[in-house]
A protein has these predicted regions:
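Conserved alpha-helical scaffold segments that buttress catalytic/binding sites
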Residues: 2-328
Length: 328
């Protein structure tokens, strides 16, 4: 299909990021090996794309700020050292154009119809982009933004393959009932839209105290596989996660990481922080395990919120997670 078919939806990476360089000639940063030109797309095996908006978070009454995450993450990721003899090829497609939301204040409420239509258009553009990458044989890394983008990314995978699995590593089910899309509704809308079969859906790290009884019952009744945080910690995080990977077998799968699943000590800069959660090390171990399976097609990381970060702790953790995914 080619990168040209979706360029109207893409905002290229800023020159400031592309020009990142070390003061030490002996450093070999990841930025030196990232492709930004259209021609680089065709030789890449991995494509990175950002979706810098937090409209869905705002609708869900969360803390806004996630729109700033994709470029903040890039700045940390691209300063990490490139391992010697690595053959991985990465193309950075830039960000989905989301200008309509970039400068909206928290109390500046758009007309409901305008807001809904705009967010739907953003999701449509992201679905088209990710679907293009998948059909061109690329593995995809998506940086949010709010967790509502899971609707767009899972839909893209569903449109591309006959059957797929979805892992949502999250403190929340994100199965709220609502007419409009929010960061709390993507998986309900995916199931209702026949883009996701409940028996192929795994919720991991869920905290009962952060989810309504109705939605917990809905997940159970429809056949979703739910792994609650206390059970995961008791069994062992990697042991529990391996059971999911074994169950998925060879089906192409989506790995969605909502950063609020991680304890605030490791990830303070998220849309909904909590002192309870997985550790950063545990999540990196999970990503490493998932990466060993060649059928992992999408890594999506959402709800990083630089506004509330401390010394870039959260964006640095995200960069390490991506680095592990790419380079082990």
């Amino acid at each position: 299909m080619g990168i040209e078919s979706i360029k109207e939806h893409l905002q290229p990476v800023s020159e400031k990021i592309k020009s990142l360089r070390s003061h030490d000639k002996h450093d070999h940063w990841l930025i030196n090996e990232i492709g930004f030109k259209d021609v680089d797309y065709y030789t890449a095996d991995h494509v990175l794309i950002g979706c810098p908006q937090h409209e869905g978070v705002q609708r869900n009454k969360g803390r806004i700020g996630a729109a700033e995450a994709p470029d903040k993450i890039r700045k940390q990721l691209y300063k990490l050292q490139m391992p010697e003899n690595s053959e991985i090829k990465i193309f950075d497609a830039g960000n989905i154009k989301t200008d309509i939301y970039n400068n909206i204040a928290e109390d500046d409420i758009l007309n409901e119809m305008e807001s809904s239509d705009a967010l739907n258009r953003i999701h449509d553009a992201l679905t088209k982009a990710v679907e293009t990458f998948l059909k061109d044989g690329k593995n995809v890394i998506v940086l949010g933004g709010g967790n509502d983008i899971s609707f767009a990314d899972v839909r893209a995978l569903s449109n591309t393959v006959k059957e797929s699995s979805v892992i949502n590593v999250d403190a929340h089910l994100d199965m709220r009932l609502a007419d409009e899309m929010t960061s709390g509704t993507p998986y309900r809308k995916l199931v209702e839209g026949n883009h996701l079969k409940p028996e192929n859906f795994y919720e991991f790290g869920i905290r009962k105290e952060n989810n309504s009884k109705k939605y917990l019952e809905d997940a159970e009744n429809q056949g979703t596989h739910t792994f609650f945080l206390p059970d995961v910690l008791k069994e062992g995080v990697t042991t529990s996660f391996k059971r999911i990977l074994d169950d998925i077998q060879d089906k192409p799968f989506f790995f969605g990481l909502d950063m609020d699943v991680i304890q605030a000590a490791d990830a303070p800069g998220v849309s909904a922080s909590s002192p309870m959660g997985l550790t950063g090390r545990e999540v990196i171990d999970m990503v490493y395990l998932a990466r060993q399976k060649e059928n992992m097609r999408i890594l999506e990381i959402t709800e990083t919120n630089p506004t509330y970060d401390i010394d870039d702790r959260t964006v640095k953790l995200v960069s390490q997670i991506i680095y592990c995914y790419l380079l082990g």
